[in-house]
Each structure stands twice: as C-alpha cells, then as structure tokens.
C-alpha cells in the first residue's frame, strides 16, 4: 500500500520544495518562486497530479525565462563567450629571446620554423629584430617585398609551402615607431595558423614584453660564453617581474660543444632549469648554408644544429598542442 506521507515528501521535493520537519512534524512549505499552486500537494492528495503539475512547471521554466526578470541567463552568456573564443582560436605562439646579442636567437628561430613547416605544420615566423633583422638576406628575398614597416598592412612572404615570414622593416629608424603597432597585430598574425614563432632583437623593449605576455612558450637562448648566461639570468628576473610564468621557459644552450667553458648542467643550475636543450655548433654560419643550398637542402643534411633543433621541437611542441616526430634515421640532439 502506498505511504501517502512518503509520496508527499517525494513528489513535493520533485516539484521544487522540501518539507521541513521540526519535532518530527512537517511544517508547511512556502511555494517556490513562480510555482503553480496546483503543484502543492495537500495531505491525502493525488501524487500523480502533483507530479504532472511539477513537470508542467519545469517545461514552463525551460521555455520562458520570465523567472529571471527578463535578464539574460549569466550561464548562457558565459557559454556563448566561450564558444566565440573557441571559434576564433589563435595559433600557439613561441617567443625566442636571449639576454644578450650574438647568442644565435635568429638561427634557432629559423631552424625551428622551417622544421615545423617540414612536418606539415602551417608556420609563420615573425622577424622581431626590427632594426637589424636580416632574414631577407638569409633567404635571398627581394628588399621591395612587404615588410613590418607597416604591421597593419603587412602580408606574410611565403618562403616554402607552409612556412611564411613577416619581414623586418627595411629601414632601422622606423623600428621604434612600429613596435607598438606590431605588438597589437600579433593576434591577427596568429589567426588561421597552426604555429607562430617570434624572434626578438638584442635590445628588450615593450614589444619583447608583449610577446612574453602573449606567448605559450618562450625559448631562452644562451651560448658558450659565461656572459650570455649572466645576461640570461637578468632576463629571467625581468620575466619574473613581468609575471610571466616560469613554466613557459625552455632553456636552449646554442652552439654547445664538449669543449665549452660551461657545461649544460652548470647552465641549468644558473637559470634554475630542470632541462637544458643543447644545439651543437654547426661549424658553419647558418645564413651562408641557407644562401648556398636553400632551406630544404639544409634540413635534409646531417647538420648537428639541425638535429639539435629537431630534438628541441620534439620536446617543446607537445607542450603547446602540436605534435612533432623526430626522424629515426637522424642523430638526436642532446638534453643535459
């Protein structure tokens, strides 16, 4: 036999109210906001009628948001904003920085961008040394091609299929004028791509800080000189003051050799890095190799710098959502 008190409690709770018991006796519950009186179950009433009334009330709430006073549901608004963000997704951004000049940032940036493109990743490279960037010379490009002298109207120059370059301005004196505009245009450059790598210059500026704040990962490049490590340490402290998460940093020991004054372990201790990626010295300047044989020939060679950059990407790209497979036939780079 149906226990009417239990049915009253159950169907009443399903309708949006719960009887309160004080001293063992249920108190009369006030109707919920906008609840039909027919849904209030009286002692001895029909539980099926209460259940049907509760279902009708639920349908009314779903169809008519009048209970919100005509205002937009904040949960729906948040979901709409998240959907819009996903629709306008930006490619991962990797910034290549260093504490001092001459550490080989440009070489590392070019190799990483070219290798990523060779794996079918649609990659753009931003030449961030706005004063003396010479990628145009490296790739044998015409000086009259579009460049970042006007970032808002600068289309990328295609170097190889899937590898595009945003060239530095032709005239060094415009660098200071365009760096703020370039920082604002970086999100546009990230749309429609799968990966964006941004080089920087020897002098840190607001543009450098903007890249670090926007990036998903940044490569801190040092070389064999103790002075480059000391400069990188100061750069790391600046990143900390900018509140750039340290987890985004990857330390790259460029031009590594067994005869270097510093070991990779010492560099890691100095910069408080668990891992240091070592890119071996290629013995020949990268720009000369590019001009002589082109990107494809360089990447297909057994150049130690190429192998080191390949291993760097194999370790780093999964952290930004890109997969990169190192060729089994090639010698891997060194992680110390």
Task: Specify the residue positions occupied by each region the protein language model found.
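Acidic-aromatic/histidine active-site loop/patch
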Residues: 1-93, 143-152, 237, 241, ...
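Walker A (P-loop) phosphate-binding motif
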Residues: 83-123
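Phosphate-binding loop that captures ATP/GTP phosphates
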Residues: 116-170, 175
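Switch II (G3) loop of P-loop NTPases
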Residues: 166-174, 182-210
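Well-ordered beta-strand positions
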Residues: 195, 217-220, 275-277
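Inter-motif core of Ras-like GTPase G domains
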Residues: 205-226
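G-domain G4 guanine-recognition motif of GTPases
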Residues: 223, 249-261, 279-284
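Beta-strand-loop-alpha "switch" segments that mediate conformational coupling across diverse proteins
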Residues: 255, 267-297, 309
